Amino acid sequence: MAERTSESSSESASFDLEKQQSNHHDRYQSSVSSELEESLKKYPVISNPQDFIVTLDGPDDPDLAVNWPLAKKLRNVAVMGSACLCAGFGSSIFSGAVPEVMVKFHVCRTVALLGISLYVLGFASGPVVWAPMCELFGRRRPMIIAVFIFCIFHIAVATAKDIQTVMICRFFCGFFGSSPITTVAGSFSDMFSARTRGLVIAVYSAIIFNGPLMSPIVGGFIGKSYLGWRWTSYITAIMGFTAFTSMIIFHRETYTRTITEIRASKVRVLTGNYCLHAKSEEEPLEFSYFFHKYFTFPLRLLIFEPILLVVSTYTAFVYGILYGLLEAYPVIFGESRKWRLGVESLPYLAIFVGVCIGCSSVALFQPYYFKKMDENKGRPVPEARLPSMMIGCIVFPIGIFWLAWTGNYPWIHWIVPTLAGSFIGFGIITIFQQTINYIIDCYSGCSASAIAANTLLRSSFGAAFPLFTTQMFNNLGIGWAGSLVGFVAVGLIPVPFMLFLYGPKLRQMSKHCLKD
């Protein structure tokens, strides 16, 4: 029942786009030249075109991703998760290569750090392309192609002879690596109903954050070892090719539109009737139409949807802090406490623990969400996702202030600022994962584009923060630099509470949001 209601809400959310498609198609048909019109008289006119449209067999069709066996869904989740892990892992493993890159190419630390920032900037620009691609061609094909090219560019980084090649290739690593990160949330929306989606998104969120958290530790020890900085990229490429191979073997298409087109193609071959087609195949092949409907849609959502803009800005700040910590921890534990490269990254493990605790806490709030869904006749209730985020938004600044003022004094035992990371990790993951759930529930009819808009904004912050974090902590001092970030986090605490109170009214005013 939940799957049917979710599907009906998706149809209502995309009604305006379908109407626009129909109007555009009518104008296209009316522009046929008179010469072509004359030649068309030789061919019979189909009086019942609806009879030639191939559709799925209702909401219970076994080919629909939401109706797949659980084992098949989990297999898809595993291979997509591995691709996301590679993309996140590659973003910050380069931090371990920074000292050697500075020496090898005779550049300052800020220039070397561009290897991280340009990668995350690729994360920001990629969704503008990958979200439309996954709406046009399905989730599988664009993702597989992107993961393969992602691996090729990592090999190019590893074999680069100059700093320009390193930076350009790092950008394209992020650009193509953003494909699975952008696509996966939409694919989860295809496979899981609102009732079960929360736990899957929790796993996805853990992958998104734990990749960047674990890779600096690996990168630090690799950069210091006999392998050298180039192996930070070789290892990421090896991981990527493993994920690529797994996707080719095990991954299956989840997007309903593409599944219908695949069925139509099979039916044409089996029947020999090449008039048979899916409704989506009637779209006019005009660039202006596709550009307006697909390529600008994430940007329009971000600009004109207040809910999406507010939660994406909050997520962007949190994501920026995550990448800012990649530079703050070397200052706190490396420069201040004189820890060596590799060892100075070990406190990231505390953030990792906090992320894992935050993910497991989702299960505690599931009964509350189920209760609200049952009260709403089985329909999703986006605001019921927010209580755990309310806790996270309070815990997050506590961790920031704790880290700032205990890390400020080297004579305080190292375990004290290290433990602050668990609070930061808990806050980051609860804010992030419930934001993703909230967006998917609100924009179920265009979830891939909404997540793309969110990814674009948060990755822009992630690219910017590492560039000024080191200077900020050196100039303001660890205590006040951390406090500045903490005060901003405190200022954002009201966001989930305001959405909990006024979210339903804002959704009623939206063109694309789920209505009560």
Swiss-Prot record:
Its main location: membrane. This is Uncharacterized MFS-type transporter C530.15c. It is a multi-pass membrane protein. It comes from the Eukaryota. The keyword Protease does not apply. The modification Phosphoserine is found at residue 31. PROSITE patterns: MFS. PANTHER family: MAJOR FACILITATOR SUPERFAMILY, SPERMIDINE FAMILY TRANSPORTER. Belongs to the major facilitator superfamily. Residues 1-35 are annotated as: Disordered. It is found in: Membrane. One of its GO terms (molecular function) is spermidine transmembrane transporter activity. The chain crosses the membrane at residues 77-97, 111-131, 143-163, 166-186, 198-218, 231-251, 301-321, 345-365, 386-406, 412-432, 439-461, 481-501.
